A protein has these predicted regions:
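Bacterial N-terminal signal peptides
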Residues: 7-16
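A structural signal for short loop-to-beta-strand junctions that line the ligand-binding cleft
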Residues: 73-78, 96-133, 149
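Short beta-strand->loop
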Residues: 96-106, 123, 149-152, 236-255
Length: 257
């Protein structure tokens, strides 16, 4: 029978299950590369004596590796970045649904997968990120970009910069909007966004921030930490970019982050 894996964006599973295993080793495949994670791994090993064998790669590389290894894969825990990638792994049948009161008590229902037929949950969320709107503080009024819906409003025609809609960051945003607005309204919203683009989608999130600051467009969409990196940068040119843009965490009066 094909082996499946547990997809966790939380190491709580390791605390609850792997710590009881006879082998004092956990094999972790991770697409996350942050200093906070390093501290978490080190603290876990200090507290339990369990060694973490880690394989680092991007999300696509990890999924491809799991498929190639098949039932021989040594992976115990998988960390992927973004719900869209977790969804893809779930659809590919790579995750083993588990029942864990510890995880279910610690992680809200909106940050974990829907239960499988046996009641097990394929994956749990470990952290969240905000998809924010940046805007030209001179040419755009904050109230015109207070919601995601306004990105598709005709009043913002010709103002929008955004990376490819095929990127998981945007797929997750589109999925969230569809969840709240429904398919018909979200389709109209997406068409409105296309009509509002100042240029064809290109670059990453940092490029959208820079494009707004440079006047190529007036509104951009980015994950919040890209802006935070530029704010903390030692480069004067990065800080100059940040000075030119405002930031909105959309839909604060309703379902936003």
């Amino acid at each position: 029978m094909k082996k499946q894996w547990v997809a966790l964006a939380a190491l709580a599973l390791v605390w609850g299950a792997a710590a009881q295993a006879q082998e004092q080793v956990v094999n972790l495949y991770s697409a996350r590369h942050y200093s906070t994670d390093e501290a978490l791994y080190n603290n876990f090993t200090k507290a339990t004596g369990i060694k973490i064998n880690r394989v680092d790669a991007d999300d696509a590389g990890i999924i491809a590796r799991l498929k190639a290894e098949g039932s021989a894969s040594p992976a115990d825990v998988i960390l992927l970045v973004d719900a869209a990638r977790l969804w893809r792994g779930e659809q590919d049948g790579l995750f083993l649904p588990i029942k864990s009161k510890l995880l279910e008590d610690a992680i809200p229902a909106n940050l974990r997968a829907a239960p499988a037929a046996d009641g097990g949950i394929p994956w749990f969320g470990f952290s969240t990120r905000a998809r924010v709107v940046v805007y030209d503080k001179v040419r755009v009024k904050r109230e015109d970009v207070d919601t995601y819906e306004e990105l598709g409003d005709p009043k913002n025609k010709g103002k929008l910069c955004i990376r490819s809609g095929a990127h998981p960051y945007n797929l997750s945003l589109f999925g969230a909007v569809t969840e709240h607005l429904g398919p018909e309204k979200s389709e109209a919203w997406l068409k409105g966004m296309v009509d509002n683009m100042a240029r064809a989608p290109k670059g990453g999130d940092t490029d959208q921030i820079k494009a707004v600051a440079a006047g190529e467009c007036q509104i951009g969409v980015t994950n919040s930490y890209y802006l935070a990196r530029m704010m903390r940068s030692d480069k004067p040119e990065d800080r100059a970019v940040v000075e030119k843009v405002g930031v909105v965490f959309p839909n604060q009066a309703s379902w936003g982050t």
